[in-house]
Amino acid sequence: MLIDSYDRVVDYLRISVTERCNFRCQYCMPEKPFSWVPKENLLTFEELFLFVKVAIDEGIRKIRITGGEPLLREDLDKFIKMIFDYAPDIDLAMTTNAYLLKSTAQKLRDAGLKRLNVSIDTLKPEVAFAIAGKDVLKNVLDGVNEALAVGLKVKVNMVPMKNMNAQEIVDVLEYSKKRGMTIRFIEYMENKFASKEISGLKSDELLSMLREHYEFVDEGYDGASPSRYYKMSDGYRFGIIEPYGDDFCKQCNRIRLTAEGQLIPCLYFDEALSIAKSIKEGDIVAASEVLRDVVKNKPEKNRWGGEDGEVSTRAFYETGG
């Protein structure tokens, strides 16, 4: 079992298989980076899987595949099958923008993927274009429909932004609700790579807008989930992810691995340790030691909240949020 210095059990590994993305979302990466990491610098799926086995043996029980956009990496379904075959009881999920999902959903399901988180920030094509930098909405919605059709469980993520999509929170909630998908509204996480024009809705503003349409009660946090959940009078639940809240980090159970082999204890901070050398050399003992060191050095909380809140210098497209 992996336990950090604040007595939090760390059992969730997020793996970014690529930093590349086919969107240029305003809140993440509106401009193309000066250069992508050369593909030869990325760990192969076999190397990533070697570390996955180490992590599972040390106590990891949930794995999420992220990017960038993970579906841009060729043969992703084969990597998922490696994990599933080794540990079929692992909670195996993926976060995607769904642009390429229609043609890949069945393969992912057959490989052992169980759940998806999909970003749907709007239901208006012109707003989707403004957010993502290209015409994406039809592909995204077609991908979601296909994922549901093949039996994948889907959650929706939405980042409400003033003067852009905030007026659509009810529409996207209803879209999700009618299809049996939980929606989580995510407060915009300030970072130096995002557009300077963005102003995100805070949770109190969001709740005030939703109360004009619904009655609901606060159910609090669901285990180690980053979402605070609310239950509507008809039983439907929606979540709000509040990185600025005092309780956001209290039960954090996750670490992140980049495609280059950097193991990151916290989304907010730049600090990381590399497992690349030990994995390439097949040194399982050394890789386990790095894993335990990263868990031991997880910070208590991020620095978004409070009067002295800071802007993160982390490139979220490298770590998958």
From Swiss-Prot:
<dbReference type="Pfam" id="PF06463">
    <property type="entry name" value="Mob_synth_C"/>
</dbReference>
<keyword id="KW-0547">Nucleotide-binding</keyword>
<feature type="binding site">
    <location>
        <position position="95"/>
    </location>
    <ligand>
        <name>GTP</name>
    </ligand>
</feature>
<dbReference type="GO" id="GO:0006777">
    <property type="term" value="P:Mo-molybdopterin cofactor biosynthetic process"/>
</dbReference>
<dbReference type="InterPro" id="IPR007197">
    <property type="entry name" value="rSAM"/>
</dbReference>
<feature type="binding site">
    <location>
        <position position="189"/>
    </location>
    <ligand>
        <name>S-adenosyl-L-methionine</name>
    </ligand>
</feature>
<dbReference type="InterPro" id="IPR006638">
    <property type="entry name" value="Elp3/MiaA/NifB-like_rSAM"/>
</dbReference>
<feature type="binding site">
    <location>
        <position position="155"/>
    </location>
    <ligand>
        <name>GTP</name>
    </ligand>
</feature>
<dbReference type="GO" id="GO:0051539">
    <property type="term" value="F:4 iron, 4 sulfur cluster binding"/>
</dbReference>
<protein>
    <recommendedName>
        <fullName>GTP 3',8-cyclase</fullName>
        <ecNumber>4.1.99.22</ecNumber>
    </recommendedName>
</protein>
<feature type="binding site">
    <location>
        <position position="28"/>
    </location>
    <ligand>
        <name>[4Fe-4S] cluster 1</name>
    </ligand>
</feature>
<keyword id="KW-0408">Iron</keyword>
<feature type="binding site">
    <location>
        <position position="119"/>
    </location>
    <ligand>
        <name>S-adenosyl-L-methionine</name>
    </ligand>
</feature>
<comment type="function">
    <text>Catalyzes the cyclization of GTP to (8S)-3',8-cyclo-7,8-dihydroguanosine 5'-triphosphate.</text>
</comment>
<keyword id="KW-0949">S-adenosyl-L-methionine</keyword>
<comment type="similarity">
    <text>Belongs to the radical SAM superfamily. MoaA family.</text>
</comment>
<comment type="pathway">
    <text>Cofactor biosynthesis; molybdopterin biosynthesis.</text>
</comment>
<feature type="binding site">
    <location>
        <position position="64"/>
    </location>
    <ligand>
        <name>GTP</name>
    </ligand>
</feature>
<feature type="binding site">
    <location>
        <position position="252"/>
    </location>
    <ligand>
        <name>[4Fe-4S] cluster 2</name>
    </ligand>
</feature>
<feature type="binding site">
    <location>
        <begin position="254"/>
        <end position="256"/>
    </location>
    <ligand>
        <name>GTP</name>
    </ligand>
</feature>
<dbReference type="GO" id="GO:0005525">
    <property type="term" value="F:GTP binding"/>
</dbReference>
<feature type="binding site">
    <location>
        <position position="25"/>
    </location>
    <ligand>
        <name>[4Fe-4S] cluster 1</name>
    </ligand>
</feature>
<dbReference type="GO" id="GO:0061798">
    <property type="term" value="F:GTP 3',8'-cyclase activity"/>
</dbReference>
<feature type="domain" description="Radical SAM core">
    <location>
        <begin position="5"/>
        <end position="227"/>
    </location>
</feature>
<keyword id="KW-0342">GTP-binding</keyword>
<dbReference type="InterPro" id="IPR013785">
    <property type="entry name" value="Aldolase_TIM"/>
</dbReference>
<feature type="binding site">
    <location>
        <position position="21"/>
    </location>
    <ligand>
        <name>[4Fe-4S] cluster 1</name>
    </ligand>
</feature>
<feature type="binding site">
    <location>
        <position position="249"/>
    </location>
    <ligand>
        <name>[4Fe-4S] cluster 2</name>
    </ligand>
</feature>
<feature type="binding site">
    <location>
        <position position="266"/>
    </location>
    <ligand>
        <name>[4Fe-4S] cluster 2</name>
    </ligand>
</feature>
<keyword id="KW-0479">Metal-binding</keyword>
<keyword id="KW-0456">Lyase</keyword>
<feature type="binding site">
    <location>
        <position position="27"/>
    </location>
    <ligand>
        <name>S-adenosyl-L-methionine</name>
    </ligand>
</feature>
<dbReference type="GO" id="GO:1904047">
    <property type="term" value="F:S-adenosyl-L-methionine binding"/>
</dbReference>
<dbReference type="InterPro" id="IPR000385">
    <property type="entry name" value="MoaA_NifB_PqqE_Fe-S-bd_CS"/>
</dbReference>
<dbReference type="InterPro" id="IPR013483">
    <property type="entry name" value="MoaA"/>
</dbReference>
<dbReference type="InterPro" id="IPR010505">
    <property type="entry name" value="MoaA_twitch"/>
</dbReference>
<keyword id="KW-0004">4Fe-4S</keyword>
<comment type="subunit">
    <text>Monomer and homodimer.</text>
</comment>
<dbReference type="Pfam" id="PF04055">
    <property type="entry name" value="Radical_SAM"/>
</dbReference>
<dbReference type="GO" id="GO:0061799">
    <property type="term" value="F:cyclic pyranopterin monophosphate synthase activity"/>
</dbReference>
<dbReference type="GO" id="GO:0046872">
    <property type="term" value="F:metal ion binding"/>
</dbReference>
<keyword id="KW-0411">Iron-sulfur</keyword>
